[in-house]
């Protein structure tokens, strides 16, 4: 914090504030900390900017916070696609690296596009529930002739909840 205060002192040459590394450090501090009564405090999670809009690491401004169930990290996600044909070697057919905060379900079509470009589209694509929704079940077949196989998540919207009768 003292370094940032010195850099923004009116006697400090302005060009020092314009160094990219200094700006990344400043934004990381703004996103993660605040000063209260002269003391540096960590921002509560509820006051942080959304994961895709904040700097979570001064070392890599593209690395973002993510969580999946009980695991949390700052970095990226890697989506691997593997061939699973019987009596054949299992081979990695596609690697897609994304920002960690992006939803897995939004990567399914990107994987299919990449596999199509390489002429490696499977007739069936077995995935976990994070990569399936009702729209993808239809569009994977209609656009790519791929049968998407995987459990769908339960509908948790308010419309899907049982009606409670008013008394």
Model-derived segments and their meaning:
Residues 1-167:
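Anion-binding and metal-coordination hotspots
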């Amino acid at each position: 914090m003292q370094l940032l205060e010195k850099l923004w002192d009116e006697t400090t040459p302005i060009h020092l504030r314009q160094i990219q590394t200094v700006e990344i450090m400043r934004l990381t501090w703004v996103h993660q900390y605040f000063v209260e009564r002269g003391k540096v405090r960590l921002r509560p999670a509820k006051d942080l900017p959304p994961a895709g809009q904040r700097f979570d690491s001064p070392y890599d401004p593209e690395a973002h916070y993510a969580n999946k169930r009980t695991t949390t990290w700052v970095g990226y996600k890697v989506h691997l696609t593997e061939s699973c044909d019987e009596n054949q070697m299992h081979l990695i057919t596609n690697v897609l690296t994304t920002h960690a905060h992006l939803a897995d379900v939004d990567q399914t079509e990107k994987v299919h596009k990449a596999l199509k470009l390489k002429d490696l589209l499977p007739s069936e694509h077995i995935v976990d529930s994070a990569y399936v929704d009702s729209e993808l079940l239809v569009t994977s077949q209609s656009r790519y002739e791929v049968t998407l196989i995987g459990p769908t998540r339960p509908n948790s919207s308010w419309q899907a909840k049982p009606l409670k009768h008013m008394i």
